[in-house]
């Protein structure tokens, strides 16, 4: 070792010793999440498990996470997992972190697979990338290569959770999330990967299926106009509303009915309008879903002033289709009470 390297290691070891208590807490808490990891799944998909991969609990990297390879031959590969803190200032981890751990572990498998076949999908990737470039930039994926690497890794991450369901999120939800981020061909990708799942007698591992994945990418690029149309049609929108927004509330009507273009997930979120002059129509009645398409808000006319305008907005994030695609934007709604 060089003097500089020895000094770096000395400083590192001293820092670790000084903060050993915090690292012990981090290790214990992170292990409560890692215990749910299905290592056998990695072996079944790639022919090799993650046993030789180390997980580093980083307290100096903020919430950032990344995968790394050993610098010299024989050094182990691994992933670095950042953390947040609890109210006592100790390392804290969300139960949703398992998605990040799986994602980072998979980079050690998916990156080499894609690199081996990159020359066969390069041209197709150049067709896809301009359509999603702006959204990818928001995710810090600034090139065609990084975009396709993350698409493939996200695809396998979703497949993991399809095979290993976890409370709080599903493969359907993760697919919609990635589509909304900009990987707008992810639902097609998941549909295509069913061919792999249904023909494991022919394809022992993902490596065996890579020629078919290459064909899928090339076909997707050639059909991307339809991919764009499909994505634009996935987001639910309002097809009917009564009474019509910005109208006078008819006498005898005490329920606002809002119908959507797709069967909905069943959640809702209602917020006041940004215009402080317009009050929400406060009511003791709970909104409800009349059916999978129709959302109802019951008004209490006795609490509403004559001639006054009321309003609210439907929060797009809560009004999701059954496939968990949210509305494209918030929907503002107002009505005016009759003067008499």
What are these regions (language model features)?
Residues 1-7, 11:
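Single conserved hydrophobic/aromatic residue that forms the stacking wall/gate
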Residues 157-239:
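Pan-zinc metallopeptidase signature
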Residues 24-32, 88, 96, 138-144, ...:
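Second-shell loop/turn segments in exported
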Residues 113-180:
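Post-HExxH zinc-binding segment in Zn-dependent metallohydrolases
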């Amino acid at each position: 070792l060089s003097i500089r390297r020895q000094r770096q290691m000395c400083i590192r070891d001293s820092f670790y010793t000084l903060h050993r208590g915090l690292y012990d807490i981090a290790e214990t808490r992170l292990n409560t999440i890692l215990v749910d990891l299905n290592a056998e799944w990695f072996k079944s998909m790639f022919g090799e498990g993650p046993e030789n991969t180390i997980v580093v609990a980083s307290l100096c990297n903020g919430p950032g996470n990344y995968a790394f390879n050993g610098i010299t031959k024989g050094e182990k590969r691994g992933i670095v997992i950042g953390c947040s803190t609890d109210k006592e200032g100790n390392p804290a981890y969300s139960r949703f972190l398992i998605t990040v751990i799986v994602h980072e572990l998979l980079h050690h498998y998916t990156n080499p697979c894609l690199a081996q076949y990159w020359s066969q999908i390069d041209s197709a990737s150049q067709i896809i990338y301009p359509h999603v470039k702006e959204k990818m930039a928001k995710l810090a994926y600034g090139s065609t290569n990084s975009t396709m690497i993350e698409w493939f890794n996200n695809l396998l991450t979703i497949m993991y959770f399809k095979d290993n369901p976890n409370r709080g999120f599903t493969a359907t939800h993760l697919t919609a999330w990635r589509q909304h981020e900009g990987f707008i061909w992810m639902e097609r990708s998941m549909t295509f990967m069913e061919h792999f799942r249904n023909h494991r007698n022919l394809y022992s591992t993902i490596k065996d299926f890579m020629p078919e994945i290459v064909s899928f990418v090339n076909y997707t690029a050639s059909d991307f106009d339809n991919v764009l149309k499909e994505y634009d049609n996935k987001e639910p929108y309002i097809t009917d509303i009564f009474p019509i927004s910005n109208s006078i509330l008819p006498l005898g009507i005490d329920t606002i009915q809002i119908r959507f273009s797709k069967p909905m997930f069943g959640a809702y979120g209602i917020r006041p309008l940004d215009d402080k002059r317009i009050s929400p129509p406060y009511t003791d009645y709970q909104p409800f879903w009349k059916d999978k398409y129709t959302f109802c808000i019951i008004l209490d006319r006795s609490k509403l002033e004559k001639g006054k305008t009321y309003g609210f907005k439907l929060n797009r994030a809560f009004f999701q289709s059954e496939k968990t695609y949210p509305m494209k934007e918030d929907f503002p709604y107002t009505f005016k009470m009759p003067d008499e």
